[in-house]
């Protein structure tokens, strides 16, 4: 495809347009008086959101070069969201300001590479100061952080605080939709481990990139699976039962993985596979723990057990399994509670007789996973649109609270960034020329989150920042007062701020040092059938035989390659059957 190229200032200005387009839509979502963004959906009702990452992902710009800028800043939001779970709007605001200030200076003759060095030096200074100002999160502050992160919603803050208190910070907390109008907290058996799906083709929710299985059957084995021949009998039983199916194995690869993916995508099986967690003997122990939790029999080579002998009675079960690219969460049924408690007691006895401190720590980790359980936050609302909105807020708040427990908190409302901005003056004055300018770009950007929080609350951002610097107090956008934000419980997770800073400087510096922007030239839309000079009938499509499905594994009825539809009349694709045995 032909490419459109922009050079030098022209390329950077086009990229800046894309950055501004996205950032201006995103930054209305920051602070306790943030505004909502309504997003049209192709199907169903529109979404109403107050989440920077969600807004950024939905934006496409007609100009292909400007759209590159939009995608760069969307990358900032998504990367911060992925790493910290929150802080996407802060990262977007910081990036926009750095890009704007950087391009002004480049247009005035500044060297982009020197600006980049100055920005990176400024970032290193800021991160050091941020770490020194961070304080550990005490138990009473958890609800405050959760409430602030939920936009001041005290109900959400209270529910998350209760969930954290019950399952602890190491426990599993999941958010799901409820059939009722009320948002409730439910504690059940379950656990999570750090392994994701074997293939992204198992994903059931494309927007969230998550695979969810309701009431699945579970095969657990310490064997490596590279062919499905031995699994044919149990797969046939699963297909007849119509149950979702999870395979948890040492590894699943090659022909076995390919065949599962093909049958998943053709609708023959609702299946997913996950590699077993940990390594060596600890992997086997972890599989035994999961087997007890789910009521499964561990199919182990040590016991001379083979996969071709597996029956439906050897499989485990769960209420729900949620799999992301790097994590699996199991919500178990209550009928295994006694077995789990017995397993925990056995592990506690092992701790007492184990001399190795390292082994004791590993066993205690297993105890925490088994005993912690799963906290289910069931989100209730009057409408589907409100439920989606509320669920997003709870997920953001939960992620921010976990981040706060990991690395501590600092004064919120952007106050800490303003204080560090003042400290940057000393570093700036000892630097020279464009290096100093790069540091000042970071310095100015640190003021922007507070300015936007104030603006969204109906105040003048410049005036608010000046008052914060004069009074040495933070600005409470809810009350419009200047006060000690730590005493008021307005706290930001240090991890969220750190990652927002790192991601924003990274993308802004790359954009400022860009000399050429290249994008595909959009192809003109094809003329509609029956248009001027065309055949009014629009042409007849070629007729073809329906495609024949691929061959599946022997003995597996209905399993195999999906059929490929033949060519037909315009708008009428040929029907293709799934491969028959």
UniProtKB/Swiss-Prot annotation:
Residues 523-542 are annotated as: Disordered. Forms a cylinder of 14 subunits composed of two heptameric rings stacked back-to-back. Interacts with the co-chaperonin GroES. It is found in: Cytoplasm. GO terms for cellular component: cytoplasm. ATP binds at residues 29-32, 86-90, 413, 492. It catalyses: ATP + H2O + a folded polypeptide = ADP + phosphate + an unfolded polypeptide. Gene3D superfamilies: GroEL (3.50.7.10), GroEL-like equatorial domain (1.10.560.10), TCP-1-like chaperonin intermediate domain (3.30.260.10). This is Chaperonin GroEL 1. Belongs to the chaperonin (HSP60) family. One of its GO terms (molecular function) is ATP-dependent protein folding chaperone. The gene is groEL1.
């Amino acid at each position: 495809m032909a490419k459109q190229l922009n050079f030098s200032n022209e390329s950077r200005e086009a990229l800046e347009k894309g950055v501004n387009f996205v950032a201006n839509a995103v930054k209305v979502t920051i602070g306790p008086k943030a505004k909502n963004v309504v997003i049209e959906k192709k199907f169903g009702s529109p979404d109403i959101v107050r989440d920077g990452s969600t807004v950024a992902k939905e934006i496409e710009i007609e100009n292909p070069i400007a759209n590159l800028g939009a995608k760069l800043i969307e990358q900032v939001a998504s990367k911060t969201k992925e790493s910290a779970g929150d802080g996407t709007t802060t990262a977007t605001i910081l990036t926009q300001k750095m890009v704007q200030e950087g391009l002004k200076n480049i247009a005035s003759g500044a060297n982009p590479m020197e600006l980049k060095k100055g920005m990176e030096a400024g970032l290193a200074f800021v991160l050091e100061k941020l770490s020194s100002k961070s304080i550990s999160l005490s138990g009473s502050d958890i609800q405050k952080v959760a409430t602030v992160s939920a936009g001041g919603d005290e109900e959400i803050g209270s529910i998350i605080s209760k969930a954290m208190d019950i399952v602890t910070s190491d426990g599993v907390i999941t958010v799901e939709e409820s059939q009722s109008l009320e948002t409730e907290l439910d504690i059940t058996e379950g656990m999570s481990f750090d392994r994701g799906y074997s293939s992204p083709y198992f994903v059931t929710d494309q927007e969230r990139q998550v695979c969810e299985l309701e009431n699945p059957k579970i095969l657990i084995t310490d064997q490596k699976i590279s062919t499905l021949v031995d699994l044919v009998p149990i797969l046939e039983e699963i297909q007849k039962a119509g149950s979702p199916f999870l395979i948890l194995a040492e590894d699943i690869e090659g022909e076995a993985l390919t065949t599962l993916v093909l049958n998943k995508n053709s609708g023959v099986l609702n299946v997913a596979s996950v590699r077993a967690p940990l390594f060596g003997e600890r992997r086997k122990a972890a599989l035994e723990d999961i087997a007890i939790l789910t009521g499964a029999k561990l199919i182990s080579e040590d016991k001379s057990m083979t996969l071709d002998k597996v029956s439906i009675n050897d499989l485990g079960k769960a209420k729900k399994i949620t799999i992301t690219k790097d994590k699996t969460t199991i919500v178990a049924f209550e009928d295994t509670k006694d077995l789990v408690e017995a397993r925990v007691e056995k592990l506690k006895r092992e701790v007492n007789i184990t001399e190795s401190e390292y082994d004791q720590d590993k066993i205690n980790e297993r105890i925490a996973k088994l005993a912690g359980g799963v906290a289910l936050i069931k989100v209730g609302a009057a409408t589907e649109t409100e439920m989606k909105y509320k669920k997003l807020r709870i997920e953001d708040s939960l992620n921010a609270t976990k981040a706060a427990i990991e690395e501590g908190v600092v004064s919120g409302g952007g106050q800490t960034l303003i204080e560090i901005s003042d400290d940057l003056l000393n570093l700036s004055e000892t630097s020279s020329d464009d290096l100093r300018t790069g540091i000042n770009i970071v310095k100015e950007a640190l003021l922007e989150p507070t300015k936007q929080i104030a603006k969204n609350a109906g105040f003048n951002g410049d005036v608010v920042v000046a008052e914060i610097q004069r009074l040495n107090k933070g600005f409470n956008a809810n009350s419009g007062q200047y006060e000690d934000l730590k005493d008021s419980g307005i706290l930001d997770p240090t991890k969220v701020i750190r990652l927002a800073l790192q991601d924003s400087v990274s993308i802004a510096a790359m954009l400022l040092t860009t000399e050429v922007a290249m994008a595909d030239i959009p192809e003109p839309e094809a003329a509609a059938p029956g248009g001027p000079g065309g055949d009014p009938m629009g042409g007849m499509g070629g007729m073809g035989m329906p495609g024949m499905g691929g061959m599946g594994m022997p003995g597996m009825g209905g399993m195999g390659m999906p059929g490929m539809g033949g060519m037909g009349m315009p708008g009428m694709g040929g029907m293709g059957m799934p491969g028959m045995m």
